[in-house]
Amino acid sequence: MTRIKRGYIARRRRTKLRLFASSFRGAHSRLTRTMTQQRIRALVSAHRDRGKRKRDFRRLWITRINAVIHETGVFYSYNRFIHNLYKKQLLLNRKILAQIALLNRSCLYTISNEIKE
């Protein structure tokens, strides 16, 4: 019988895994089994946090808008401000409103005066 030599597929797979895990600490970057487990954990965390990042930014924008509104006493609350925006059909999302609140407060005051009941 002729000798069958091992292929390169498993080695290539482990090399790819090693490159992915090269920045991990300790055995997580050296041992194949722990590298595999850590890779799965890293990808799970990345997937989860992509959704979480969207929620976090939305919370930040709402907090910034609310802070400027309360500082000036323009409206009673953020809630009423957004409600009046929708009633007047002004299409400004929270990200844009937060940028306006930070960079150009007088513009936000003008918007609030426009939508007052």
From Swiss-Prot:
Classification via InterPro entries: Ribosomal_bL20, RIBOSOMAL_L20_CS, Ribosomal_protein_bL20_C
PROSITE patterns xrefs: RIBOSOMAL_L20
Pfam family, one: Ribosomal_L20
Location(s) in or outside the cell: Plastid, Chloroplast
First-listed, main subcellular location of the protein, grouped into a coarse class: plastid
GO molecular function: rRNA binding; structural constituent of ribosome
UniProt-listed PANTHER family: 39S RIBOSOMAL PROTEIN L20
Protein name, per record: Large ribosomal subunit protein bL20c
